[in-house]
Amino acid sequence: MSDCLLPSSDMDAFRKILKKANSVVILTGAGVSAESGVPTFRGAGGLWRTYSAQNLATPSAFRSNPSLVWEFYHHRRENMASKSPNNAHNAIAEFEHRMTKEGRHVSVITQNIDELHQRAGSVNVLELHGSLFKTRCLKCKKIEPNHDSPICEALRGKGSPSPNEVGELVPESLLPRCKVSSCGGLLRPHVVWFHENLDSAVLKKADEELNSCDLCLVVGTSSVVYPAAMFAPQVAERGVPVAEFNMETTAATHHFGFHFSGPCGELLPKALAP
């Protein structure tokens, strides 16, 4: 990208706009959680055993081998026990609390499934891709929060990422099961898999937030996963200031009024400070 196309990196100018904003949308992606040590399972080195996320995070993979897929997600859930919200998550949560006290509005729309925003204290969080800590019953369709560790006894000690530590598959009858009355249906992770559509109700709410905001922040996202990749450019098209915070420029950077390069955990505490 040539310099003439680069947006402003003037933090003082951004903060003047921030102080006047009444409704702020903060779009977050994997770059925010990466600073907490959360693996993305995308790109080089993003393997679990010998599988990529594209091999396991699909409806067909779950139909053919639910035990293997549950081991993968059990590993990811258990791995989160050692992870904590970082300075970026905390800065966003503190900003939301401060704005709420002043009668202003902040909404976090995240592509992440790790609930680190909520653990930091964010309240208005829309999870575009679901959550590692929610389940959905294939039989009754009930969605439930679930922070059990392990999620079921049969998965205790399972899910090692090492291809040398593969034990016997857990029988389907012992995988996580629905506890709603007498349902007993097989549970799946409540996450959006490859080849699945995003939840229409979540998209509708996101659209409402994006259409009513007067400032938008794009934080730690490569802006390549659709439909989220189009959210901020569409906000910019209606003349609303958009600021991107990322380690590098993206395919969408030229749409935005501001771009700040660097770790989100360093940039956001400065950008969102009182």
UniProtKB/Swiss-Prot annotation:
Active site: 129 (proton acceptor)
Positions of Zn(2+) binding: 137, 140, 178, 183
EC numbers on record: 2.3.1.-
Keywords: Metal-binding, Mitochondrion, NAD, Transferase, Zinc
The keyword Metal-binding is annotated on this UniProt entry: yes
GO CC annotation: cytosol; mitochondrial matrix; mitochondrion; nucleus
Compartments (UniProt record): Mitochondrion
Annotated residues for binding of substrate: 73, 76
Record note on cofactor: Binds 1 zinc ion per subunit.
UniProt similarity note: Belongs to the sirtuin family. Class III subfamily.
Function: NAD-dependent lysine demalonylase, desuccinylase and deglutarylase that specifically removes malonyl, succinyl and glutaryl groups on target proteins. Has weak NAD-dependent protein deacetylase activity; however this activity may not be physiologically relevant in vivo.
Comment, domains: In contrast to class I sirtuins, class III sirtuins have only weak deacetylase activity. Difference in substrate specificity is probably due to a larger hydrophobic pocket with 2 residues (Tyr-73 and Arg-76) that bind to malonylated and succinylated substrates and define the specificity.
UniProt-recorded name of the protein: NAD-dependent protein deacylase
Source species of the chain: Daphnia pulex (Water flea)
Lineage per the UniProt record: Eukaryota, Metazoa, Ecdysozoa, Arthropoda, Crustacea
